[in-house]
């Protein structure tokens, strides 16, 4: 059997994955997620990796930047899941990493955003397997002091932690605190003012866009992962959809 692993509702990775694969069907304002009820819900990127690593018939989907060699990423339509293929547009399953905030940022939070978008910040983005989005010059901020609270996506969190670590070395007056939940919770926190900056691994929804300012800090693929022992190497988007909607239930239907 194919053991399907999915992310929770509120996960930006789930929102982007279901939309890009056609599992999510839109009819006007109505959206229907046709993921089969037999898919097991898992609440973080790391937990999906662990679950697929420990189950030789499992399939899951994660942030490409979080991929490691304990699991295998499948090609999609013959195209490998790599940052280069995301950048060129050849890899079909990709999405933005967004940060969002309400109104004007504090001096120190704005300085941190300037750092992320600088060539220094974008080097960290690409060094960690994500796709850069800005051609800005090197960071030359005033290094204001203060605290910055960042909250949201488990996909964005790993690169945000690296960015925060590097920024705090450059600006020793700043303290960046990161709380990881999911994209929707991050946007709610930003709208409610309980964090300075929210993180989302998807496009913002209309109600979020109307309340928040948004900036894309990186692009990321969504890797479809299986156990290293699985002999399947390549699926089409339609095959991925057919697994997650419950039409395809056994690997032998795919692996001939």
Indicate residue ranges for each PLM-predicted region.
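Exported/periplasmic ABC-transporter solute-binding proteins
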Residues: 1-256
